[in-house]
């Protein structure tokens, strides 16, 4: 079975990319157990709780990330450099447990996947 990586690199609520990526991730989890989630660049904002998408007339899908464990999606990485660049602390309580990785280590980890889907 192919190893699949889902990379979230866009901020939530500005486009439908994050919501569509999450939908694709949950659907793919029914077909394979070998998938991992990466949060890089502005995608790190997908991990923050307390967002108010109704202010921009968007649907609040961020809470759905909390369901990843129910779908047996347990491997989540977040780019430590992306967190620093955006003034976020790796100790921030995220909506899912994501392990910080430096950019070089994250690239090496991504190289282990057969398919990389970016949202």
From Swiss-Prot:
Q: Decide whether keyword Metal-binding is in the record.
A: no
Claim: Membrane is one of the keywords in the record: no
Gene3D superfamilies, sorted: DsrEFH-like
Where is it localised?
Answer: Cytoplasm
One GO term of the cellular component aspect?
Answer: cytoplasm
Q: Which InterPro entries match?
A: DsrEFH-like, Sulphur_relay_DsrE/F-like, Sulphur_relay_TusC, Sulphur_relay_TusC/DsrF
Top-level taxon: Bacteria
Q: What is its main location?
A: cytoplasm
One GO-annotated biological process of the protein: tRNA processing
Q: State the UniProt keywords alphabetically.
A: Cytoplasm, tRNA processing
One protein family per Pfam: DsrE
- Output the SUPFAM superfamilies linked to this UniProt entry: DsrEFH-like
Describe, as the record does, how this protein assembles with itself and its partners.
Answer: Heterohexamer, formed by a dimer of trimers. The hexameric TusBCD complex contains 2 copies each of TusB, TusC and TusD. The TusBCD complex interacts with TusE.
Summary of the function given for this chain in its UniProt record? Part of a sulfur-relay system required for 2-thiolation of 5-methylaminomethyl-2-thiouridine (mnm(5)s(2)U) at tRNA wobble positions.
Family, as annotated:
Belongs to the DsrF/TusC family.
What name does UniProt use for this protein? Protein TusC
């Amino acid at each position: 079975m192919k190893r699949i990586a889902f990379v979230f690199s866009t901020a939530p609520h500005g486009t439908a990319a994050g919501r569509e990526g999450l939908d694709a991730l949950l659907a793919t989890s029914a077909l394979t157990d070998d998938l991992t989630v990466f949060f890089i660049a502005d995608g790190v904002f997908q991990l923050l709780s307390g967002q108010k998408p109704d202010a921009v007339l968007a649907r609040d899908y961020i809470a759905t990330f909390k369901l990843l464990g129910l779908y047996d999606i347990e491997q989540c990485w977040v780019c430590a450099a992306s967190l620093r660049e955006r003034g976020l602390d790796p100790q921030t309580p995220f909506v899912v447990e994501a392990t910080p990785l430096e950019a070089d280590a994250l690239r090496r980890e991504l190289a282990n996947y057969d398919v990389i889907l970016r949202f």
